[in-house]
Amino acid sequence: MGSALDTLKEFNPKPMKGQGSKKARIIIVQENPFDYEYRKKKYMTGKAGKLLKFGLAEVGIDPDEDVYYTSIVKYPTPENRLPTPDEIKESMDYMWAEIEVIDPDIIIPTGNLSLKFLTKMTAITKVRGKLYEIEGRKFFPMIHPNTVLKQPKYQDFFIKDLEILASLLEGKTPKNVLAFTKERRYCDTFEDAIDEIKRYLELPAGSRVVIDLETVKTNPFIEKVTMKKTTLEAYPMSQQPKIVGIGLSDRSGYGCAIPLYHRENLMKGNQIGTIVKFLRKLLEREDLEFIAHNGKFDIRWLRASLDIYLDISIWDTMLIHIIDYRGERYSWSKRLAWLETDMGGYDDALDGEKPKGEDEGNYDLIPWDILKVYLADDCDVTFRLSEKYIPLVEENEEKKWLWENIMVPGYYTLLDIEMDGIHVDREWLEVLRVSYEKEISRLEDKMREFPEGVAMEREMRDKWKERVMIGNIKSANRTPEQQDKFKKYKKYDPSKGGDKINFGSTKQLGELLFERMGLETVIFTDKGAPSTNDDSLKFMGSQSDFVKVLMEFRKANHLYNNFVSKLSLMIDPDNIVHPSYNIHGTVTGRLSSNEPNAQQFPRKVNTPTLFQYNFEIKKMFNSRFGDGGVIVQFDYSQLELRILVCYYSRPYTIDLYRSGADLHKAVASDAFGVAIEEVSKDQRTASKKIQFGIVYQESARGLSEDLRAEGITMSEDECEIFIKKYFKRFPKVSKWIRDTKKHVKDISTVKTLTGATRNLPDIDSIDQSKANEAERQAVNTPIQGTGSDCTLMSLILINQWLRESGLRSRICITVHDSIVLDCPKDEVLEVAKKVKHIMENLGEYNEFYKFLGDVPILSEMEIGRNYGDAFEATIEDIEEHGVDGFIEMKEKEKLEKDMKEFTKIIEDGGSIPDYARIYWENIS
């Protein structure tokens, strides 16, 4: 029987042995030598080696005398693939012998495989930077310098790990690390808890106090959370949303943990109530400075669960870190603990206890003895971070302006919007549930009718029958082929649905689409296989009717899973849902949201024969004021394109906007060589898509595919010609893009007009695809980030005005560049006028926003009985017709339009889908 290494030896017969001093204190182990290392007969050569050796020297480690370099497998692999497990296993005896001879103080695995086979640990990015003692040997995993060059986001961790390594060799605390003697207090008794809170109550004015909560999942508004059946039976009280514990700290090195409603808390109910009263007294002290990490989460829970209002501005170390470094770096405390403190890995014990699956996020299920240690440590880490981060804001005027004018007011504005929430029509939600389940089933049945699918399922059934026959043979009497089939064909068990195609399986879809149907795509996975993702389906849409049905199925499934079935679990007893909005959610500065993800609410469709038109998701959101209220939406018009003008300041474009001309038509007229009045709907859509595509730095190929998905045929070459004509008409845009890309290559950062910085370390990546993506982000971020800050400032000003004016209207949703309000009908005109004025004239309300200059900013209004049935309107429309009159007029126009379309379908011999027939019969 041959060796697993024979194939490698065939091309490179000589093993590449380790190199370095036999008295080295460190062994650095990689999986195997790269081709270029093997050719030069030297480990850690090239850029990666230079980076490592320079870094070692910088921290005082001699890269020649102190280090021995080696690999587990001593041969390069074809195309630099990772070694196979068999190749590594066969090499391990030599590896251990090498370690015995050198006898180093520390062994450094630099990849996931070397980590696994040396230590039995996995996930090097998670365990790196920490010393582990295993069977008498010390291991210190680090990320390979080649990975750092490809993904510069790991550079900070790499530098930090080298500093820690040097300190370990010297027996000292690493430099630039916030290290303190750890002092902890776990208040497991009523007396200890009261004593600790009283100590904080006696702190002098101006003292800083960290707060942190651990909770049952993330939503404090609902009555019950979802849990696994077995867990629920064991811990029924853990289904109730509650604060299970609170942590506090008033100095670095210190942390305390107090149990509140944790299932293991033995205190009596009245004692917990007394603790809450003392906490309220502490947290509502206006002369203290409170600190938190992702504090909006804590404040939201305190308000909703304990009716404690922590309304003074708090220092949020996560937000400060985002101001200082909005980029690909991690801003969660456990990551920052590695970078800034000596407490990296403080959450390791918790990781092993975290509930999974349906119980994920339910910290009531974690034993208190483990949770309290994590909670106190979390507070300590946050206080240490605050001592480094708060001065970053206080001592920098630009960051201070961002903090005081956007971050903190935005933080509390979003909190108000979350607390108010948006009303849900439960009856319509139930209609959606029944209808979507029926439609998904219909589409699935339709896909199974295609002959290739029929044949595939027949083969699956036949394989199961063959397995049953093999099962009747005693295992000892089966041939190797039969035994192999018996194992493989287990997956075709009909009792588990194995005899039917799973249309959610990429593997089965790949077989069906590419092997059986013979479809072709230009989109591939990272492993080189043809992709079944949405972009690939769009590309293949014209090749097969099956793909069109599959796309419908995927869309219906997505909407059902994300907005129909899940949303019913997020509604509070008053039929309100409370999305959580995150300033830190995206690296460009745009808001993100969850529970539900408002940013993914589907756009309206305008074709009455489509399923989504008849069962509109957004229609479930209506006014909390019942028949006396309406939903009013204000949307910035072409905000990002207008902000682009702020960067290149071309009077012609400003005049075009001022005149009220249609920019998309004007650009289309020039690009397609037709008079502006002759520009078709498809040409305008193409113009709009391509202009926004330029902002997002989309390629001509990508734009062509996007347009094809819209039913518009424009080849890659035609899109390229359009782009060139656009830049010819707007040369300053082209120059600004070139200058921005050049600038980011010099300093690796870009800024928005509001001064927010985004770091783009991947611009220096040796992986060209990552460097190219960083270039694209360098162009997109200033525009999208500035636009997001304009919307956020509008939210701040509108929310402030509504509350100060005593009106009942409230902001209920914000999505990208739009602001949605829930208004009593008698407030609509007053609110509409003010909201529109604020959105279009930010510079009048905050002088900093005068950077918008002469560029006209426009907002457009929609109004309706619910979020889905909203109609475009002007203030003049409402003044002329009244709220009810205008909506009734638009509803009538909509019905007439739909009736004409249905009538035409019937006259042309077509048929109306079953799901639309009830609607047709009602309007006819």
Curated annotation (Swiss-Prot):
InterPro entries, A to Z: 3'-5'_exonuclease_dom, DNA-dir_DNA_pol_A_CS, DNA-dir_DNA_pol_A_palm_dom, DNA/RNA_pol_sf, DNA_polymerase_A, RNaseH-like_sf, RNaseH_sf, Uracil-DNA_glycosylase-like
Reaction equations catalysed: DNA(n) + a 2'-deoxyribonucleoside 5'-triphosphate = DNA(n+1) + diphosphate
Gene Ontology biological-process annotations: DNA-templated DNA replication; double-strand break repair; viral DNA genome replication
EC number annotated for this UniProt entry: 2.7.7.7, 3.1.11.-
SMART domains attached to this UniProt entry: 35EXOc, POLAc
UniProt KW keywords: DNA replication, DNA-binding, DNA-directed DNA polymerase, Exonuclease, Hydrolase, Nuclease, Nucleotidyltransferase, Transferase, Viral DNA replication
Superkingdom of this protein's organism: Viruses
Domain 3'-5' exonuclease residue range list: 235-386
One example GO MF annotation: DNA-directed DNA polymerase activity
Pfam family of the protein (one): UDG
Function: Replicates viral genomic DNA. This polymerase possesses two enzymatic activities: DNA synthesis (polymerase) and an exonucleolytic activity that degrades single-stranded DNA in the 3'-5' direction.
Family label: Belongs to the DNA polymerase type-A family.
Protein name as catalogued: DNA polymerase
Annotated source species: Bacillus phage SP01
Lineage: Viruses, Duplodnaviria, Heunggongvirae, Uroviricota, Caudoviricetes
